């Protein structure tokens, strides 16, 4: 378990959504990866996931960040100090695509150790499924394109992480 605010976020998420799987992995990152910027070694947290319309469609975004490489992403991003995983999800989705969410469900937490060989930084990603309160997309300033899909795009970042959740959305199991 992680210390301090990290532990508080984890406890809050489990209290609200029940215990979910925690997937652990290590990823090699280049020395200029944003995770290594700054002096903090505290774990970082992000929230995101599949935002669906209730009819099996999910929304993905493309950002203008060069590091994104033109790939599609789920809406989401880094949490602010003191922000809970679900509050961060709602804020990020509102900022990125202009949509309010209903009934977010936490499906897993991914604990990733990023290393460049010399340094290691830990991050936690709270992965959700949530229903969109509207289907009208209003991309924010960081988003260059937002679109509804009825399948996972081949160039979706972290595509394998979303296979199971997408299947749940498509079959409307529990949602």
Protein language model features and the residues they cover:
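Acidic, metal-coordinating catalytic segment for phosphate/diphosphate chemistry
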Residues: 2-48
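Conserved hydrophobic/aromatic beta-strand scaffold that supports enzyme active sites
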Residues: 50, 60, 127-129, 148
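Active-site-adjacent beta-strand/loop module that shapes the phosphate/pyrophosphate-binding cleft
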Residues: 53-55, 110-136
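A short coil-to-beta-strand element that immediately follows conserved catalytic motifs
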Residues: 100-109
């Amino acid at each position: 378990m992680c210390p301090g605010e990290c532990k508080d976020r984890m406890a809050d998420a489990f209290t609200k959504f029940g215990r979910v799987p925690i997937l652990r992995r290590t990823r090699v990152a280049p020395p200029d990866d944003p995770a290594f910027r700054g002096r903090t070694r505290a774990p970082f947290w992000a929230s995101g996931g599949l935002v669906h319309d209730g009819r099996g469609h999910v929304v993905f975004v493309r950002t203008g960040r060069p590091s994104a490489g033109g790939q599609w992403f789920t809406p989401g991003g880094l949490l602010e100090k003191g922000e809970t995983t679900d509050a961060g999800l709602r804020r990020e989705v509102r900022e990125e695509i202009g949509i309010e969410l209903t009934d977010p469900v936490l499906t897993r937490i991914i604990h990733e150790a990023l290393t460049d060989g010399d340094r290691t930084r830990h991050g936690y990603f709270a992965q959700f499924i949530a229903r969109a309160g509207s289907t009208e997309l209003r991309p924010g300033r960081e988003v260059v394109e937002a679109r509804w899909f009825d399948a996972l795009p081949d160039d979706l970042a972290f595509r394998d992480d979303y296979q199971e959740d997408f299947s749940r959305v498509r079959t409307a199991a529990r949602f």
